Amino acid sequence: MSDEEQSAIVCDNGSGMVKAGFSGDDALCHVFPSIVGRPKNEQAMMGSASKKLFVGDEAQAKRGVLSLKYPIEHGIVTNWDDMEKIWHHTFYNDVRVNPESHSVLLTEAPMNPKQNREKMTQIMFETFGVPAMYVGIQAVLSLYSSGRTTGIVLDAGDGVTHTVPIYEGYSLPHAIRRMDMAGRDLTEYLMKLLMESGMTFTTSAEKEIVRNVKEQLCYVALDFDEEVTNSAKTVNEEPFELPDGTIMQVGNQRFRCPEALFKPMLIGLDEAPGFHEMTFQSINKCDIDVRRDLYGNIVLSGGTTMFKNLPERLGKEISNLAPSSIKPKVVAPPERKYSVWIGGSILSSLTTFQTMWIKKSEYDEAGPSIVHNKCF
């Protein structure tokens, strides 16, 4: 039996992207959007053998004639039928294996409702017939991938941002902070900013175009007020070519959009802390003796931490909050967009981890609630 035949499958189900591949692999096999698309108009899809449903890249490619839906919102599955379609696509079309022959490691944000992971567990065993499975916390897996056992992870994806302090390999649950604002909220904010300057984006397909604008052109201002002043003095516009060939000029929206990560009130979240405040609050909830080590290992993870200048701005803002003798160190691994998956690949291939899997026999005996006993 080849290694690949018995390797576990690691599937990081993000709100925006699915990352999947074999345990122990260095390189990620498959990345595709967590989208399910259905024809807006049944008659319009004659050529596709009147297919009723498209998943991932195929849905993205046909987005002009489809209505697109993300079954995961803010890290929580809101449509289990569509989620099942995404897992089916992952196993059979992307990784191309029969899940009945492979253990599966899934990921989830901390502080999710208990029934979310119970339902994940149930579907894996009952619908896909996996022999064993495990649910890992995203930020903890990111720390594994950075080669550290102590640090605070700031993980910001498409749906959820969370800070998880970990000391000597143990996460400190009482100090975890979670905010239901992340990349998708920034995309919506950018849509609003662009519409204020006269552009119109309304459909689910056009929202995907705005997401591309965000990922390609937006950056974090090191000093927001200074950037506003400078942009008023000089023309700081970047062209973006729309699918129909029209060129759109994007100006100060480029740095106004990600500013919401530090000032959530910009998008109507008046009580929510910014990235720097979340990190600071999390560290302050930890024992005084471990705080210095956490300040020295602030590890970024997830696609929404990929903005230019974000690590530097975060370091600066945390320095303003921390005791004066502390020099915060923000670690921004270049592969951080995929570090949750990489950590899952590392963890699931360790010999010491093999006793951690939830086996089918244990599930049959205890039911879906077994996931709370065996997975942190």
Curated annotation (Swiss-Prot):
Protein name, entry field: Actin
Keyword match Cytoplasm: yes
Gene Ontology MF terms in the entry: ATP binding; hydrolase activity
Family to which the UniProt record says this protein belongs: Belongs to the actin family.
Organism: Trypanosoma cruzi
Listed EC numbers: 3.6.4.-
Catalysed reaction, written as an equation: ATP + H2O = ADP + phosphate + H(+)
Keywords: ATP-binding, Cytoplasm, Cytoskeleton, Hydrolase, Nucleotide-binding
Protein's cellular compartments: Cytoplasm, Cytoskeleton
Top-level EC class: hydrolase
Coiled-coil regions listed in the entry: none
This protein's record includes keyword rRNA-binding: no
GO cellular component, one term: cytoplasm
Biological role: Actins are highly conserved proteins that are involved in various types of cell motility and are ubiquitously expressed in all eukaryotic cells.
Any matching Pfam family: Actin
